[in-house]
A protein has these predicted regions:
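Glycine-rich phosphate-binding loop and adjoining helix at the ATP-binding site
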Residues: 108-187
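Short beta-strand(s) of the beta-wing in winged-helix/HTH DNA-binding folds
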Residues: 28, 57-58, 155
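Basic amphipathic alpha-helical segments that dock to polyanions
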Residues: 21, 32, 43, 47-56
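Canonical helix-turn-helix DNA-binding module
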Residues: 38-49, 66-68
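Gly/Thr-rich phosphate-binding beta-strand-loop-beta motif of the actin/hexokinase/Hsp70
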Residues: 70-107
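Extreme N-terminal segment that seeds HTH/winged-HTH DNA-binding domains in transcriptional regulators
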Residues: 1-35
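Beta-hairpin "wing" of winged helix-turn-helix
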Residues: 51-67
Length: 187
């Protein structure tokens, strides 16, 4: 059994809090504490840090359900981070931009042929990523990564598209590596 150090535990707790807020937000600290099973002090410390870093937002007060103060509602800041998604089929390339709440901000569809080469596809992906990022004025440091859906079979350990039956120019293509080098983002 592997030991977990304090930093790993803190990182785990922060991810747990963020993922819970993404799923259930807006949410009060009390409900958040109940859902994640951490102490009130830990939840307060984590959420205060995330508010200070502008990763979370305060979204008003909860409706009064009993006596006492209304609870402050927390949600993730949709513009704190962004992700990119790429879907490649034999007929279409789609590149999308999503915010931190998982909402699609925008996407671009490009009609392609199954004879497209990997180099042509990577060029198209880069052009459309750049267009979306510039159009929505997303700072590079807010881009956390790229998810890719492509015809298989795919070797998940090496990132190679091995022998897709409908893309004749795509035998043993290291798509993950090509995109990481070109986009300078995790894929």
């Amino acid at each position: 059994m592997q030991k977990i150090n304090g930093q790993d535990m803190k990182r785990h707790n922060v991810h747990l809090v963020i993922n819970t807020i993404i799923k259930y937000g807006p949410i009060s600290r009390t409900e958040l504490r109940d859902r994640v099973g951490l102490t009130a002090a830990t939840v307060i410390n984590i959420t205060n840090d995330l508010l200070e870093r502008n990763i979370l937002l305060q979204e008003g007060l909860a409706a009064a359900s009993s006596k006492g103060r209304k609870a402050l509602m927390l949600n993730v800041n949709p513009t704190a981070f962004y992700t990119l998604g790429v879907s490649l089929t034999t007929r279409r390339l789609r590149v999308g931009l999503a915010n931190f709440q998982g909402q699609i901000v925008d996407h671009v569809d490009v009609t392609i042929r199954n004879t497209i080469t990997p180099e042509e596809a990577v060029d198209l992906i880069q052009q459309n990523v750049q267009m979306l990022v510039e159009k929505h004025q997303v700072p590079t440091e807010k881009l956390v990564g790229v998810g890719v859906a492509a015809p298989g079979p795919l070797d998940t350990h090496t990132g190679l598209i091995t022998v897709p039956p409908d893309l004749p120019n795509w035998r043993n293509v290291p798509l993950q590596k090509l995109l990481e080098e070109r986009l300078q983002l995790p894929v």
